[in-house]
């Protein structure tokens, strides 16, 4: 299933994997998965984390390695984001609930994910998605950006 991914997608997933793999040992544990999910405003139980790992843990060793992660991501992409998932993702970024994602909100979420971005990088991300040029990302722009991936 991971065969359908482009080199660019694989490179993006490698970057995402390393955000999860906090200690850099090449595997994602339930603890590491929990850390990332909590930084995104989720609050999974230990059992839910274990279920998520088990769902993709092909060799049954209790952790996710990169090939297993790729397979999970390929599956998720095939199921493309539902409206509900997009709304939830938008809410993670739109911290004050005003229906717009500001540069500060974007920087906050990216920092929580361990991505230290310069102001220029954050501004560039906003500019890329900001179709109407108001300096913020609204829901329609967010959906367009997510679907373009």
Swiss-Prot record:
Transmembrane segments: none
Binding site for Ca(2+) 3: 94, 96, 98, 105
Domain EF-hand: 8-43, 44-79, 81-116, 117-149
Residues the record lists as binding Ca(2+) 1: 21, 23, 25, 27, 32
SMART domains named in the record: EFh
GO molecular function: calcium ion binding
Binding positions (Ca(2+) 2): 57, 59, 61, 63, 68
Other remarks on this protein: This protein has four functional calcium-binding sites.
PANTHER family attached to this UniProt entry: CALMODULIN LIKE 3, MYOSIN LIGHT CHAIN 1, 3
Family (UniProt): Belongs to the calmodulin family.
Function: Calmodulin mediates the control of a large number of enzymes, ion channels and other proteins by Ca(2+). Among the enzymes to be stimulated by the calmodulin-Ca(2+) complex are a number of protein kinases and phosphatases.
UniProt protein name: Calmodulin
Gene source species: Stylonychia lemnae (Ciliate)
